[in-house]
Each structure stands twice: as structure tokens, then as C-alpha cells.
């Protein structure tokens, strides 16, 4: 089980698509529970812990204390990267995966996250590499209208700083689109098609590029997986700073997401929210309902929900069409299975954009 732990609701950025810090009344900026509660969970089951915010590194002392006291199998952190240089290299050795928020090329990242942010995140990635960090460094993109999926993903891979690139679409919870349908038709889907070909061509030459959504879809295609693919409420739970146990880390004010609290003596919080129409869909094995929050809230209504389903299916169909070719490359020893099927455990990569 992965536990996504809010270390604080505070953030040191105010990105265009999320607005910065969480309101204190929903996600307090200080921890309101004892770390002993986390130790009790770790005694009952094998757990991984992902530190989340706000900006999680703003509460670095809490992170250090959890690492010291809670016997988790693996530690993960999702960070904007601005405070990476404030921590000793030995601190980073505790983490199996580090996700750095960066949206692609400099102009796009700075447009959404603030002037100079691209350079600071790239600097953070360099610091990790030069310190000898050997874990998984993931470029975590938020993709919106100024982005170009092919350009931005290939750019980040070309830096040789990131093992994997993952993106999430800024859809459903945002109305800040001039013409979403046109963007999907003329930018996103042509870019996805081009990126799939680029991925396949590199594999034919013996290189597996770390394009996380493609790898995750292929892995689910072969091995299956939980629904939704991020694991929300099935093999991932979130713990807010006030001790509430949530189905999803961004559903901090939705009543449906409140499963329990750390004070309750409840042993199993798992539940499955994803039902029809997703469970009847022919891509459910790969898609798993895509996103629990989007499934439950449907801010764009049924039409918007269905439009996102359609281009998600297109992405899955593209990977399906290449499945046999990819597996043949594995069987011939051209590429290695352990490089291809990613992630090997729930490391907070949502898989479906």
C-alpha cells in the first residue's frame, strides 16, 4: 500500500493551474497528529510512503523524522525542486523515486510556474545527479494549452537528467482553455502519435525511453492493475496534515473522499469507487477509469468526461497496435523487460494522463 502523506498545505510557488498553497482550513500547514500513528500502520502492513504538499520540502524536519521512525519499504517525494539544494546528499539516498515538477521547455515551464523556475528545477536535477543519486528521477509535467507533448517530452529526455517523464493533463478541474477540442485535435493527439513512433523507433535500436504513460499502459495491458491506475482508495491512500485518511490527495474538501482518520481503529480503508460506464469499457484493463477525482466530480459534465475518454482510448489503441512488435523486441533480447514495464510498484505515477 502506498500512503501519500501531506507534509504541509503550504507551497512556495503559485502556479497558474493550481493557485499555490491549500487553504489552511482544509489542509493545515502543520502536522496535527503523532508520527506514532504512521508507525502503527507500518506494523500492520508493508507500506511505501510518498511525501506530498503543498511543497513537501517546506516541512523537511517532519520528512526526516518519518524516515527515521517509520519502517516503510520505500520513500518517494513529489517536489517542485526549489529546495533540493538545501538538503544534504545523504538525505536523498533515502528515496527510491524523486518526482520534480517541470512542464517541458523553459518558456512553457516559466509561463505556468513562474519566471526562472525552469532553470532552478534543472539545477536541482543536476544536483541530484552530481551527488551520486542512483534512484529514479521523474520529470512530472502538467500539460496545458501552451504545451507541445512531443517537443516537451523529448526535450526533457534529451537533458539526460530524468529517468522517466510523466505528464498529467490540466483538464476537468480547470476552465482555462481557449479551445480544448481544437488543441486535442491539432496538437495533443498528433503529438502523441509522433511520440509513440519515436518511442518505438528507439526501442528498435535498443533504447527504452522512459515515457511513463506509454510504459504504464503497456504494463497494464500485459499484467492488469488496479482501478483507478493511480491506486486511489485501492492500493493508495492519502493522509492529510490533520490526520484524515483520504481516497485521493487532491480531494481534500470532498466528503466522498474522507474514508477515516488516523484516530479511528480501522484496519482496512480500501474501497473501489470506479463503476459504470468505465467498468463496461473495452479499455478498462488499461485505463482503469483514468482518474478517481475526475470520475467523481465531472466538472466538465458528461460531454467533457466523454471527450477525455475518447482521446484516452486513442492513446491506448496506439500502444495496443504496437504491442506485438514491442514484445518481439523483448523476446529477441533487443530490449530488457525490466526497463520496459514501468512502474514496477505504485510510485505515485498516475499512468493515464
Model-derived regions, located:
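Canonical Radical SAM [4Fe-4S] cluster-binding loop centered on the CxxxCxxC motif
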Residues: 1-33
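Cysteine-centered iron-sulfur cluster-binding motifs in ferredoxin-type domains/subunits
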Residues: 6-14, 55, 233, 278, ...
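Glycine-centered loop/turn positions within well-structured domains
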Residues: 13, 107, 246, 289
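A short, flexible beta-alpha/helix-coil linker loop
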Residues: 21-25, 105-108, 172-175
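Residues that line or immediately flank small-molecule/substrate-binding pockets and catalytic motifs
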Residues: 22, 53, 102, 169, ...
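Radical SAM enzyme [4Fe-4S]-AdoMet core and its adjacent flexible, acidic
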Residues: 27-33, 115-122, 126, 130-245, ...
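Radical SAM/AdoMet-radical enzyme domain recognition
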Residues: 36-40, 44-50, 59-171, 181
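Flexible mid-to-C-terminal extensions adjoining Fe-S/redox cofactors in radical SAM and related proteins
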Residues: 250-353
Amino acid at each position: 500500500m502506498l500512503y501519500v502523506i501531506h507534509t504541509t498545505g503550504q507551497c512556495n510557488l503559485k502556479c497558474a493551474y493550481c493557485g499555490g498553497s491549500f487553504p489552511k482550513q482544509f489542509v493545515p500547514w502543520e502536522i496535527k497528529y503523532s508520527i506514532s500513528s504512521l508507525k502503527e500502520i507500518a506494523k500492520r502492513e508493508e507500506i511505501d510512503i510518498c511525501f506530498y504538499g503543498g511543497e513537501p520540502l517546506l516541512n523537511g524536519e517532519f520528512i526526516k523524522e518519518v524516515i527515521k521512525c517509520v519502517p516503510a519499504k520505500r520513500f518517494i517525494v513529489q517536489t517542485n525542486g526549489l529546495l533540493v539544494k538545501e538538503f544534504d546528499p545523504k538525505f536523498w539516498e533515502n528515496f527510491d523515486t524523486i518526482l520534480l515538477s517541470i512542464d517541458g521547455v523553459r518558456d512553457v515551464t516559466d509561463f505556468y510556474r513562474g519566471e526562472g523556475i525552469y532553470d532552478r528545477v534543472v539545477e536541482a536535477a543536476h544536483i541530484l545527479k552530481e551527488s551520486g543519486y542512483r534512484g529514479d528521477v521523474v520529470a512530472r509535467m502538467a500539460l496545458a494549452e501552451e504545451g507541445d507533448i512531443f517537443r516537451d517530452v523529448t526535450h526533457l529526455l534529451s537533458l539526460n537528467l530524468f529517468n522517466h517523464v510523466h505528464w498529467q493533463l490540466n483538464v476537468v478541474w480547470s476552465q482555462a482553455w481557449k479551445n480544448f477540442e481544437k488543441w486535442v485535435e491539432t496538437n495533443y493527439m498528433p503529438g502523441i502519435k509522433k511520440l509513440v513512433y519515436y518511442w518505438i523507433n528507439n526501442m528498435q535500436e535498443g533504447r527504452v525511453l522512459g515515457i511513463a504513460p506509454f510504459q504504464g499502459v503497456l504494463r497494464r495491458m500485459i499484467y492488469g492493475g488496479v482501478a483507478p491506475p493511480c491506486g486511489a482508495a485501492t492500493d493508495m491512500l492519502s493522509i492529510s496534515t490533520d490526520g484524515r485518511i483520504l481516497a485521493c490527495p487532491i480531494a481534500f474538501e470532498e466528503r466522498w473522499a474522507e474514508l477515516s482518520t488516523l484516530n479511528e481503529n480501522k484496519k482496512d480503508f480500501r474501497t473501489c469507487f470506479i463503476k459504470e460506464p468505465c467498468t463496461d469499457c473495452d479499455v478498462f484493463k488499461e485505463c482503469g477509469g483514468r482518474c478517481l477525482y475526475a470520475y467523481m466530480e465531472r466538472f466538465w459534465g458528461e460531454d467533457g468526461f466523454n471527450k477525455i475518454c475518447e482521446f484516452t482510448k486513442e492513446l491506448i489503441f496506439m500502444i495496443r497496435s504496437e504491442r506485438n512488435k514491442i514484445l518481439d523486441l523483448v523476446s529477441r533480447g533487443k530490449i530488457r523487460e525490466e526497463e520496459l514495464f514501468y512502474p514496477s510498484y505504485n510510485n505515485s505515477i498516475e499512468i493515464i494522463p
